[in-house]
Each structure stands twice: as structure tokens, then as C-alpha cells.
């Protein structure tokens, strides 16, 4: 008598048999099948062909080995937009939406504001600001050519074509290096690498698969922030603002750097987990 258990043949059976977190399994199965999440419910008992099952099982194995969902699906939602993601860019996190909200607050009421995003990566911050403020002139700087390619692709996909090639400008640059010295911005924002070189988190979870240069400054976690703060006076307009994302335990240190650099109204803002996640200040003038 054949007692071999049959392989899962439907979406419902694959999900029940999956060793993954239920949400991860649903996301990957929908991606493998090209279905919406609603279709996973309405077509749950529909037989799947061998190729479809194989696609899902390959993704399941990679996720079980730790690969990030965003890299497996090639996408991540951020600020209501779906960004293309590759292993060349940092995966946008929900807490970084605070930086976008803060930048939008800083330019509220300013006509055609100038915005600078340093270390744009996937373009999540710059594209989100440009989407919310079509009148804004946004510069997005990034030293990684591969990351810039992803950012440009996201701009083309998510913004009006006129914006993707015009008021949103991408430059290959190591922080401020490629900027015209005469430029001034109403707000400068950055989510720089702020994890210290020896932080054990770099060897854990999704971070193992993301570009190391977007995560750590290969120093104490504040080196990139020091560079950005030190150069800000040359590019922040009088009365303009500088805002930086940082680690959960770095707010006080970043405020000290901003105070020492002569910024006024220095403060930190907490994310939805009540963690001080962004700090900034205003340049007097």
C-alpha cells in the first residue's frame, strides 16, 4: 500500500504546509502566482500546475534561509507607494516615513521649495517628497551607481514623467561633493549609514543581505552624520532645516552635533514605536 503523503496541490494546501510566518507565505505565494491577495482567498482550492508550485517552493526556501521578502518580491511599499527593490539598495523601513513627514512639515507653506536627499538609495525619501509636493525641486544624491539606477527607475515608475526627468534630479555624489556651491535648500534630509562597525545586528536578519555601505559607516555609527552636519552650512538656506535619521540610542549625540554646529530649535522626533528616530534643527537667518 502506498502511504506517501501527496504533495500540496492548491494554494490553500501550500499555505498550510509552509514553515514560514503566515504573512510571509501569503506574500510569496501571491508573488509566485501573480495573484492578488484577494485571489489567494477566492482561488484557494484551485489546482496549481507543477511550475507554479516550484516557483513558490523556491521562494519559500530562500525566505527560510533568511533572504528579505522585499528582495524576493522585488518590491516594498513605502509612504503609500510601491518601490522597486534590489540587493543594491537599503530596504525602506516604516520608521523612515517619519523623515518624509518631517521634511514635508519643514517645507509646508513654501512655494517651490528646494529639497536635498543625501544618500537616496532606492529613492524612497526623494520620490515620496516629490510625489506629495509636485512643486518641489528635489535633488537626490547617491554614491552607488547601482543604487542610482534603482532610484531613477522608481522615479520613472511612480512620478509624472515630467517630474522624473526634471525637478527631481539624481546625482552621483559622495554626500555634498557633486553639488554646485551656489545651491541652497529649504530642507536637507538623510538616512545615512548609522550602525557602528562592530554592531552584532549587521550579522542578523535582513541586514545580512543588504548593502553594507548603506548600513554602517565602518566607524562608530556617527561618522557619516558628522560629515553631513559639518557640511550643511554651505547648502542649507538661512532659516532652512537639516533632518537626519539615526539609531535608537543616538538622538542625544546627534542633537549635540547639531547644537555645536550652530543649528537652532534642535529637537528629536519619535517614530510609531516611541523611539527617537530623527533629529534636526534650523539654520538661523
Swiss-Prot record:
S-adenosyl-L-methionine binds at residues 119-123, 142, 175, 191. Keywords: Methyltransferase, S-adenosyl-L-methionine, Transferase. The gene is prmC. Substrate binds at residues 191-194. One of its GO terms (molecular function) is protein-glutamine N-methyltransferase activity. Pfam families: MTS, PrmC_N. The keyword S-adenosyl-L-methionine applies. The keyword Methyltransferase applies. This is Release factor glutamine methyltransferase. It catalyses: L-glutaminyl-[peptide chain release factor] + S-adenosyl-L-methionine = N(5)-methyl-L-glutaminyl-[peptide chain release factor] + S-adenosyl-L-homocysteine + H(+). Its EC number is 2.1.1.297. Methylates the class 1 translation termination release factors RF1/PrfA and RF2/PrfB on the glutamine residue of the universally conserved GGQ motif. HAMAP family: RF_methyltr_PrmC. It is an enzyme of class 2 (transferase). Belongs to the protein N5-glutamine methyltransferase family. PrmC subfamily.
